Amino acid sequence: MDPESAAERGFNRADFDLGHKVVQIDGEHDLFGDASVVCLPTHGHTPGHQSLRVRLASGDVVLAADACYFCRTLRERRLPQRVYDRQAMLASLDKLARLEAAGARIFFGHDGEFWKSVPQAPAPIT
C-alpha cells in the first residue's frame, strides 16, 4: 500500500517507518531469487495485502496472514465484515485454494484451532 493510501486508512507512518530501505512491489516477488520465499499478492482484506509462500523440504507452506483468518473462511468463503474489496478477497481465497489443492499447507492468520495443530516457536515447522 502506498503511503498516501495508508494514511487515509488510519495507518501512522511513524509506527512503521524505521528508516529501512523499502521496495514497493507489484505482483509476486521472489525474495531470494531461488523460489524459497515468495511474496504473493492476496489483496482484499486490505489493498496491497501479501501472503508468503515458503518452500520447505516437506513441501510448500503459505502464511496467509489476514488474507484468510480461519480454515472455514477458505472452505465456506465466509468473509469478515470489514473488507476493503470483497471481490479481490474472494479472488485471493481462490488463489489460496489452488495452492492448497497443489499440495501447499495454508497457515491461517487467526485460527486458534489450526494453531493448536502446528509446532510452536521455537520448534521448527517441518
Q: Locations of the language-model features?
A:
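Catalytic core of the metallo-beta-lactamase
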Residues: 17-71
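Metallo-beta-lactamase
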Residues: 1-40, 85-103
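Cap/insert and terminal regions of metallo-dependent hydrolase folds
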Residues: 49-126
